[in-house]
């Protein structure tokens, strides 16, 4: 799989960056539609995005480097080279959400009002962004048989044939799951006006899919013998259930 999309002079533009950019652009288009549904300012959303997106990239890289520091100890300058991958989505979510919270607090805007609108766009960006892993031949699962991989389209088979071995296309599993969650979140955004429900549904549903898919991957970040992504996913599921339960419970009181 060729990770280079095209060249600008001597500069190689990698598919990884192209795919992330496409995901961000389509996420913004979806947000334009969802802002109308919830009657929130799209201009304010754009301002929020301009703070959240770079914060998320920094957080995703920092999170990855912390757990893989041995790979960078002898060449620290490579920490700043993200063109070949090395972004951990959980770090991106944490830093992005924190940046948004600080910004909206400063602007005296409702945090949940805006992150509810953002949730479908975030998961859409993640669904598309996983294809960047495909072009980088990363974030795949363990070895599989030719018979198993033959059930997938030919270009997936070709991309998952790495150094003489076929691998689980876990990037594809997560991409499909994220697209399904995105559709559900857009539906939920139309059906409920309760602040926080859509965003917490995103946290819970993404975490649910990631927990199971992570178990198939061969490049997980570890804390001792524990896969970090699975640990964070469990916490995300618990937080989501707790928050949504309390919203529903509060509604029944009144």
Curated annotation (Swiss-Prot):
Its EC number is 2.5.1.145. InterPro entries: Lgt (IPR001640). It is a multi-pass membrane protein. It is an enzyme of class 2 (transferase). It holds the Pfam family LGT. One of its GO terms (cellular component) is plasma membrane. The chain crosses the membrane at residues 11-31, 49-69, 84-104, 109-129, 169-189, 196-216, 228-248. It is found in: Cell membrane. Pathway: Protein modification; lipoprotein biosynthesis (diacylglyceryl transfer). A 1,2-diacyl-sn-glycero-3-phospho-(1'-sn-glycerol) binds at residue 130. It comes from the Bacteria. GO terms for biological process: lipoprotein biosynthetic process. Signal peptide: none annotated. Catalyzes the transfer of the diacylglyceryl group from phosphatidylglycerol to the sulfhydryl group of the N-terminal cysteine of a prolipoprotein, the first step in the formation of mature lipoproteins. Belongs to the Lgt family. This is Phosphatidylglycerol--prolipoprotein diacylglyceryl transferase. It comes from Clostridium botulinum (strain Okra / Type B1). The lineage of its organism: Bacteria, Bacillati, Bacillota, Clostridia, Eubacteriales. The gene is lgt.
């Amino acid at each position: 799989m060729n990770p280079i999309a095209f060249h600008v002079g001597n500069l190689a533009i990698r598919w990884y960056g192209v795919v992330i950019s496409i995901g961000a652009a389509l996420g913004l288009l979806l947000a334009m539609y969802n802002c109308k549904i919830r009657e929130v300012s799209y201009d304010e959303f754009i301002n929020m995005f301009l703070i959240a997106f770079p914060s998320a990239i920094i957080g995703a890289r920092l999170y990855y480097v912390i757990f893989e520091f041995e790979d960078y100890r002898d060449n620290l300058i490579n920490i700043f080279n993200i063109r070949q991958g090395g972004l951990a989505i959980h770090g991106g979510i944490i830093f992005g959400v924190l940046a948004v919270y600080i910004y909206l607090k400063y602007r005296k805007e409702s945090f949940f009002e805006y992150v509810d609108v953002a949730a479908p766009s975030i998961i859409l960006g993640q669904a598309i962004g996983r294809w960047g892993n495909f072009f980088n031949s990363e974030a795949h699962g363990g070895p599989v048989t030719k018979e198993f991989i033959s059930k997938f389209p030919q270009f997936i088979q070709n991309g998952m044939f790495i150094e003489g071995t076929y691998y689980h296309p876990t990037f594809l599993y997560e991409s499909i799951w994220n697209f399904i969650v995105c559709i559900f979140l857009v539906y939920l955004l139309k059906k409920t006006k309760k602040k926080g429900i859509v965003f917490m549904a995103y946290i819970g549903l993404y975490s649910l899919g990631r927990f199971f898919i992570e178990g198939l991957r061969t490049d997980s970040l570890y804390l001792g013998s524990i896969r970090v992504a699975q640990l964070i996913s469990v916490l995300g599921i618990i937080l989501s259930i707790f928050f949504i339960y309390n919203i529903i419970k509060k509604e029944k009181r009144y």
